Amino acid sequence: MVSTDIEKTAVIKVQEEILRNKEYLSEYINSNDKTPMWDGNIYVYNNPKKEKKHYQGKIETQVKGEEVKKIKSGNSKYRIEVETLEAYNKDKKGTLLLVCKFVDLDNYQLYYANLLPIDLDDILRKAQNKNKKGKNGQIWRWWERKIRRRN
């Protein structure tokens, strides 16, 4: 599969997952996106009406796809360039990395990593000490569960 199809597949699977939890989440994620770092945002609300007064914030989101021969159980790893991590770190807000590993359209698994500023500082310090251009980072299996409103 060509890279644009891999990215599009990953974005579609992420959008489907957000739709499963649509009561409190809205996504604005583009495929074939040409922005430097992020593919879009996930907006969080504390009420299913999703009016401005119920807006809680947005999560900067990067979606990656990877075609694999087999979906492995448990968590996984994903390689990301140090230059990209440095760009995320300049924003000082954090980034939600969503990775879709798939065999085909029906056989896939979503993973995530919360790249918070404190985590990015630590990852970058370790990568620079070892003079690395890329870093394999832990990504966690996205468990299918309903997201509930905090009281």
Would you name each region that the model predicts?
Residues 4-79:
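Catalytic centers of nucleases
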